[in-house]
Amino acid sequence: MLIKNKYKHSMFPVNQNNIIEENEEIKFDLIDTDIEIPFNYLTYILNSTSYITPEILFDGFKVVLPFYQDVQLKPLFELAFDQDVNINSQNKDNGCTFLHYSVEDVKVLYDNIPQFLLEKGADPNIQNKDGNTPLHILINRDFFSSKEIYVAKLLIQYGADIELKNLLGWTPIQCFIQAGNIKLKALLQLVKACKDNDFSKLDITTKDIKEFLDWQISITPENSKFF
């Protein structure tokens, strides 16, 4: 059985349990599939190569089991960064960065890869070929939980521009209108109010004040520059 990899021109021999058994990589030319790669792909890469490329890192986001991202993708990134791989490298096909991929895939998102990348210096305002930033991608997800809200907060705290437009002319706030998550709306409204130093459209209640504190959003003009 051969498993195709979406981002790299290669296939890996695997057994019936979807595990790579042979230390061999088979090159091929046609590639355009969403089939997930084998369970032990990251271990295979760490043990078989000393040089990590951006393409290998993009591959890592397709690992089948969620815990593998947390346990093995981070060491892969650490090794790559030690080799001066640019944390803001973009996929040549779609323009997405590692941060874009980390907020798109629920399995990676739940293993705190977005926070890890932001702490390492990932730029939250890089746009892919559709003009979407990681915040656009996150807001357009079909499912929202407290984790997604937390990651949205992180993106904003690390400088995500809530009014940056994609190629359709939509800002993350306008994308929210399609997503319709109430908590996300509250977060974006609070951030915009801080940025504009205009709270006239907000009904400041006890709950709103708690959210200011929880999200560490300052209402003082001198701190609005951080947004």
Curated annotation (Swiss-Prot):
PROSITE patterns: ANK_REP_REGION (PS50297), ANK_REPEAT (PS50088)
Species the sequence originates in: Rickettsia felis (strain ATCC VR-1525 / URRWXCal2) (Rickettsia azadi)
Keyword match Repeat: yes
Alphabetical list of Gene3D superfamilies matching this protein: Ankyrin repeat-containing domain
Glycosyltransferase is among the record's keywords: no
Classification via Pfam families: Ank_4
ANK repeats, residue ranges: 94-126, 130-164, 168-199
PANTHER family to which the protein is assigned, alphabetical: ANKYRIN REPEAT DOMAIN-CONTAINING PROTEIN 54 (PTHR24197:SF44), ANKYRIN REPEAT DOMAIN-CONTAINING PROTEIN 61 (PTHR24197)
Protein name per UniProt: Putative ankyrin repeat protein RF_0314
InterPro entries reported for this sequence: Ankyrin_rpt, Ankyrin_rpt-contain_sf
Keywords: ANK repeat, Repeat
